[in-house]
Amino acid sequence: MNPKHTPIDTTGLTPEMRSHVLAEALPWLLHYRDKIVVVKYGGNAMIDEDLKRAFAADMVFLRAIGARPVVVHGGGPQINEMLKTVGLEGEFKGGFRVTTPEVMEYVRMVLFGKVGRELVGLINEHGPYAVGASGEDAGLFTASKRMITVDGEEVDLGRVGQIEHVDAESLIDLIDAGRIPVVSTVAPDDQGRIYNINADTAAGALAGALGAERLVMLTNVKGLYTDWPNKESLVSSLTPEQLSDLLPNLDSGMVPKMEACLDALRSGVQAAHVIDGRIPHSVILELMTTGGIGTMICPAGWEDIASPDINYREDLP
């Protein structure tokens, strides 16, 4: 989604309407040339076979127009399935899984060896573009143990971590070589202990470290609702300041995503998007149309320098 417009309904488009959408995309095709776009891959898009393929095609499309996509993924459903299979469903505290070293080995295997490899394969059906990576590779992420508070008491979740540092140099090398990095969110601490990192948090931190133009979060809802589950409370755009004010009252499942968006914007990312990953090609619909399909967070007045009209001029960003 891009400024000064409200979301559009993409269902039931006639050929004439589709041609209009393609023409509308031209200024955005020019705008994203050489720009890094970090996409957090999650939700139904990771489970449904058609959505997986549509997402992979979107990443190849972005590369084809000269953009520089980077994918960050989690794998909650796949991890749950694996742990159930091996009989390690485990303990929960405050709604969070306690990740023992044994559980962490399966988490690591699923994220990098299954989810990441599958997406790399789907992208590479279109050409030799994607390269799998993890937070362990070349010091990409450095983590520390994350503690939570439950009923006023600090709780140890085991190998659940938070990012302390990002060294994106290795990914920049891949991006400069025309590759699409697919990043699994496991990371070591300074003692070599491996932690599972929230993929939303990792995507936001990585977008900031890379100097990305955009951060895109795939979810299983249409965007940000200020009063979930009231469907009338869906917003198409808001500023970081407005989002900060809303944060304490948002649905708990949306909070990590919104915190990651705010962190990315504070680090210089131009805009963040929350979109419905249940819609095929949702990334392209959001970024390549003026209406978009989700919620965009951007600074006040940003629309004045991001109007599609000026993007025909190569002397402007």
UniProtKB/Swiss-Prot annotation:
Pfam families (alphabetical): AA_kinase
GO BP annotations, alphabetical order: arginine biosynthetic process via ornithine; L-arginine biosynthetic process
One GO location term (cellular component): cytoplasm
Localization per Swiss-Prot or TrEMBL: Cytoplasm
Pathway the protein acts in: Amino-acid biosynthesis; L-arginine biosynthesis; N(2)-acetyl-L-ornithine from L-glutamate: step 2/4
Keywords tagged on the record: Amino-acid biosynthesis, Arginine biosynthesis, ATP-binding, Cytoplasm, Kinase, Nucleotide-binding, Transferase
EC top class, as a word: transferase
Residues that hold substrate according to the record: G75, G76, R97, N196
EC number: 2.7.2.8
Presence of keyword Cell wall biogenesis/degradation: no
Homology family: Belongs to the acetylglutamate kinase family. ArgB subfamily.
HAMAP family: ArgB
Name under which the protein is recorded: Acetylglutamate kinase
Protein source organism: Corynebacterium jeikeium (strain K411)
Lineage: Bacteria, Bacillati, Actinomycetota, Actinomycetes, Mycobacteriales
